[in-house]
Design a protein with these regions (language model features):
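Short beta-strand segments
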Residues: 27, 69, 115-119
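Flexible, charged surface loops at secondary-structure boundaries
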Residues: 18-20, 58-62, 107-110
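Short active-site-adjacent helix-start/loop capping segments
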Residues: 35, 74-78, 104
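N-terminal, charge-rich interaction modules
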Residues: 1-41
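Mid-chain, well-packed structural core segment of small domains
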Residues: 58-94
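A short glycine-rich beta-strand->turn/loop micro-motif centered on a GG-aromatic cluster
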Residues: 92-102
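Compact, glycine-rich, soluble single-domain proteins
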Residues: 33-58
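Short basic, glycine-rich beta-strand/loop surfaces that mediate nucleic-acid
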Residues: 102-120
Length: 120
């Protein structure tokens, strides 16, 4: 079951009353896990550009939509390689500042996964 996101503030995100003080990924089955930022940092030296390797890690077969919370000020971007990959696997991507992305997430229906950056 898809967890509801209650709130986000700089440095944290709250799901179903539980606060996480790190970036998260939400899987198709509703499982919440810590984002593997090192997959992008290894390529770009920052976690603000999502690499192809990270996009492949995030994507799950069956996901039709990916909601990305790009941070409180919206600094996270997809690399061109990551964008091309997600287009190839027919996964619609929505990049929104995290406060807006949580609203989109909570209203989302169907096969949706999420990545939420909690700073910047």
């Amino acid at each position: 079951m898809k967890p509801r996101i209650d709130d986000t503030r700089f440095g944290s995100i709250t799901l179903e009353g539980k606060i996480s003080e790190h970036d998260i990924i939400i899987r198709l089955n509703g499982q919440v896990e810590k984002r593997k930022k090192k997959l992008s940092k290894a390529v770009y030296g920052t976690s603000h550009i999502i690499s192809l390797d990270e996009a492949k890690y995030i994507f799950e077969n069956g996901a039709e939509r990916l909601v990305i919370g790009t941070g409180q000020q919206g600094l996270v971007k997809l690399s061109s390689e990551a964008a091309e990959y997600l287009q190839r696997v027919k996964c619609q991507v929505e990049l929104l500042p995290t406060p807006e992305a949580i609203q989109t997430w909570n209203e989302a229906k169907g096969s949706v996964i999420g990545l939420f950056h909690v700073t910047c």
